[in-house]
Amino acid sequence: MKITPLLLIGPLLIAGCAGQRVEHPLAREIRRTGVQPEFFRIEDKDAEMHRAVKEARKTVGAFIAALKSPAKGQHDFEVKKPFVKDGEVEHLWLSEVKFSGNRFHGLVDNHPRKIKGLKFGDRVSVNPDEISDWAFVDHGKLVGGYTIRALSLSLSPERRKSFENETKVRIDTQ
């Protein structure tokens, strides 16, 4: 990834109250009936988020191996791509990820808020060294998802548990 500011908004919406409808196991979007979703804004000074991106890039080979030959119980393979346009940066998850030609190819799995002209479901590609995260679920446990883990650290234990209950995905933060 070749961006200076690390600004994450929109790609992970975490909410912890009843009435939510979870559309995806990794909870890219959680909506609450009748209210705006919560956004967690991560500024470039957030050292934990920088470490998360660095760890995701360092370990992307393990993700590629699992993606190419998933074991039983492994599913929902996704990568997070930074989109940059007119000085704006937005990190969005890609679903239905494939790896070919030394690139990830997938569908934008968030509703972009800052990058005009990009929309949910657009097919895009990204180089492995430019991702800001990767994740998949293995028997109900999050694998990778380093930015998700970093964000979950800011939640109270009760909110984290509620999030896990809603998404049916366990997040180990250690």
Placement of each model-derived feature along the sequence:
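Bacterial N-terminal signal peptides that target proteins for export
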Residues: 1-7
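Bacterial N-terminal signal peptides
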Residues: 7-15
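Mixed-charge, low-complexity intrinsically disordered regions
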Residues: 17-93, 98-174
